[in-house]
Amino acid sequence: MKKILFSMFYSILVGEEPDSVFLKKEGKQNQVKMIWIAPSSCAKDLTISEGTGATFPFHFHSRVSICFHALFLRPRNMKWTNSFS
């Protein structure tokens, strides 16, 4: 089982045959942080942990919508994008 800690809510729709999902944070001076989630390489059951210590088991299947927290706080001057590969 893998655990991921997130701190801001985001929604991602994973397609039928997902290779990976990226959350990208773009900031000043071309600094970019990315979270990479590859459902095909994760265990079928993934535990998502909150900062409060609460954990939620999550089962990956072919079509799934994931709501989760992002790893970093979003400053006002930063832009968020979702991309699928």
Curated annotation (Swiss-Prot):
Subcellular location: Plastid, Chloroplast
Cellular component terms (Gene Ontology): chloroplast
Chief place where the protein resides: plastid
Keyword line: Chloroplast, Plastid
Similarity comment: Belongs to the ycf76 family.
Protein name per UniProt: Uncharacterized protein ycf76
Taxonomic source organism: Zea mays
